Design a protein with these regions (language model features):
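Conserved ABC ATPase signature
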Residues: 121-125, 129
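Catalytic Walker B motif of ABC-type/P-loop ATPase nucleotide-binding domains
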Residues: 146-149
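The feature captures the beta-strand-to-loop junction immediately N-terminal to the Walker
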Residues: 35-37
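Conserved ABC ATPase "signature" region
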Residues: 99-117
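Conserved catalytic motifs of ABC-family nucleotide-binding domains
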Residues: 142
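Q-loop/switch helix immediately C-terminal to the Walker
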Residues: 81-92
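Helix-to-loop junction immediately C-terminal to a conserved catalytic motif
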Residues: 50
Length: 166
């Protein structure tokens, strides 16, 4: 797996460039942090890296990337579904049986210290628990590219530190 970005630029129609001449290479196992103030188009860049948006200029080459995990800036979920239902969902969507999917989902939840919350409804989770749940959902299908947008924004310092090591 390798992601190469060359001369990337982007703007929305009728606006100035949001960023320009951005180039980097992400090799397997490398973590890249994209930092900047609110509104500087970090989320837009992630959408381009995922292939959801086309850049204004430049190229993104994704070699060997066939499974992308994504964690949005704000945790979204179905209020009445359980935490386990949320993590199992992407596995079921790929055709796995619930019997096969549940152990994998619980393993991902354990990575983020959420095994205790498996039967809790999404609406009963704290903001930090919901954010960690979205991280568990993103990693349960073993993506070879993981994009996270403000992954620790709703987490306390201790939890934020432990999440960054996963």
């Amino acid at each position: 797996m390798r992601v190469a970005v060359e001369g990337l630029a982007h703007r929305f129609e009728g606006t100035d460039l949001l960023f320009e001449n951005l180039s980097f290479v992400a090799e397997p196992g490398v973590t890249i942090a994209i930092c900047g103030p609110s509104g500087c188009s970090k989320s837009t860049l992630l959408s381009i890296l995922a292939g959801w948006e086309q850049p204004y200029a430049g190229t993104v080459t994704r070699e060997g990337v066939d499974r992308v995990g994504w964690v949005f800036q704000n945790p979204y979920g179905v209020a009445e579904r359980t935490a386990l239902d949320h993590v199992v969902f992407p596995l079921l969507a790929k055709g796995m049986s619930r019997r096969e999917a549940e152990p994998k989902a619980l393993e991902a939840m354990e990575l983020f210290d959420l095994e205790y919350a498996a039967d809790r409804r999404f609406c009963a989770l704290s903001g930090g628990e919901a954010q960690r749940l979205m991280l568990a959902r993103a990693v349960c299908s073993r993506p070879n590219m993981l994009l996270v947008d403000e992954p620790t924004a709703q987490l306390d310092t201790r939890t934020s530190h432990s999440v960054s090591h996963v």
